[in-house]
């Protein structure tokens, strides 16, 4: 388990982010950057934990990302538009948050130096409708361009390419 690190978790107040924070917070300093749109953290006592700092903001704001990342050795980038209903109603925003948000995180990490590890969360959706027993090396498969539900998968696949290159 990771210990003694300062860790930025973008989207850290969401369902998975708050669960990850619960696992890391006892032995690390955790900075959460989140717009609190889906505030799963509110059902926990994390906000009161002395090792948690909440930066309320958006990954689309590069200066906020830079401020939140200051001094962090590890960055876990989870921020994205969540929920099929939200993605289908806001496909452009879904792409914007994924692509520009990830670019901001990657550029800030590169410019500040000292980042030991950057983890970019993706989704099994990049493997298509039947993502069963797939591995990261398997070919991706996306649906038809006209199907709005694939916006999320396309945006996450693009962020994978950004993070790996």
What are these regions (language model features)?
Residues 109-117:
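A short helix->loop->beta-strand "cap" motif at the edges of active sites that frequently abuts
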Residues 10, 33, 75-78, 118-124:
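SDR active-site strand-loop-helix element
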Residues 39, 81-85, 125:
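Active-site beta-alpha loop architecture of Rossmann-like, nucleotide-cofactor-dependent enzymes
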Residues 59-97:
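NAD(P)H-binding glycine-rich loop region in Rossmannoid oxidoreductase-like domains
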Residues 64, 104-108:
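Conserved mid-core alpha-helix of short-chain dehydrogenase/reductase
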Residues 12, 79-80, 109, 159:
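Small-residue (primarily alanine) positions within well-ordered alpha-helices
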Residues 1-74:
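N-terminal Rossmann/SDR dinucleotide-binding element
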Residues 89-104, 116-117, 126-165:
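Catalytic helix-loop patch of NAD(P)-dependent Rossmann-fold dehydrogenases
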């Amino acid at each position: 388990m990771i210990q003694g690190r300062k860790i930025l978790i973008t989207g850290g107040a969401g369902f998975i982010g708050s669960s990850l924070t619960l696992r890391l917070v006892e032995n690390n300093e955790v900075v959460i950057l989140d717009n609190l749109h889906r505030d799963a953290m509110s059902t926990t006592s994390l906000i009161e934990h002395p090792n948690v700092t909440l930066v309320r903001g958006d990954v689309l704001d590069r200066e906020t990302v830079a401020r939140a990342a200051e001094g962090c050795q590890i960055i876990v980038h989870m921020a994205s538009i969540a929920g099929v209903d939200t993605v289908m109603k806001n496909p452009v925003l879904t792409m914007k948050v994924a692509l520009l948000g990830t670019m901001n995180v990657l550029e800030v990490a590169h410019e500040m130096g000292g980042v030991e590890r950057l983890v970019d969360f993706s989704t099994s959706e990049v493997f298509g409708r039947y993502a069963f027993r797939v591995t990261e090396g398997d070919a991706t498969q996306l649906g038809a361009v006209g199907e709005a539900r694939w916006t999320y998968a396309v945006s996450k696949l693009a962020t994978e390419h950004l993070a790996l290159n």
